[in-house]
Amino acid sequence: MTIITPITNDPTTALLRLMAWLSPVFPVGSFSYSHGLERAVHDGLVVDAAGLQDWLQWLVRRGSGWNDAVLCAESWRCTMKGEDLHEIAELAEALAGSRERHMETMLQGGAFLAAARSWPCEIFDRLPPDCAYPVAVGAVAGGHGVPLAQALAAFLQAFCINLLQASIRLSVTGQSGVTAIMAALEPVLGETAARAALSSMEDLGSATFIADIMAMKHETQHSRLFRS
């Protein structure tokens, strides 16, 4: 029996779906990725809560977090307009700057689509079988009528929370430090989500070169906790 999940115009339903899809327990395997943070800690570039907060805010504002938010927004818009999603999916995959970043976004994207099928939607038939994570999230959010700004804010927060969880395992900070950083990042997440909601493909671009290099160097790190 096929269960059809209706497109929502109810803000509470939209919130519940975002909280489910972007929860740390949603089965995308996010806990196994550090996005290069493990190497940054290893090399002494991130050693405390202040450095971690700075690292995260620039990833969100000017780094891979920003690019992913732009891709997520474009995927959402293509979905709402009924446009083809293959081109944006190919671009998102091509923008992965290293082998482990590529693995991180593609495996999470595939796992997200598989798990999100518990909320049936026609968008799954329009997506390529291999899909980068931000494109998958944007398309599913758009397919269910979840407002763009809220989807982007939740997506960016989930990105940061995953790295904050990694920071605890890497002994950069503890739970009290993580909650303080979460609170401090709220304005950054809100402002970046608002910018991304108004973005176009011309706004793609990042300037967090050290973070990108750390992601590359992690590929040759022998002792590790994370896959990226």
Curated annotation (Swiss-Prot):
Pfam families: UreF. One of its GO terms (molecular function) is nickel cation binding. Keywords: Chaperone, Cytoplasm, Nickel insertion. GO terms for cellular component: cytoplasm. The keyword Heme does not apply. It is found in: Cytoplasm. InterPro entries: UreF, UreF_sf. Belongs to the UreF family. Required for maturation of urease via the functional incorporation of the urease nickel metallocenter. UreD, UreF and UreG form a complex that acts as a GTP-hydrolysis-dependent molecular chaperone, activating the urease apoprotein by helping to assemble the nickel containing metallocenter of UreC. The UreE protein probably delivers the nickel. This is Urease accessory protein UreF 2. It comes from Brucella melitensis biotype 1 (strain ATCC 23456 / CCUG 17765 / NCTC 10094 / 16M).
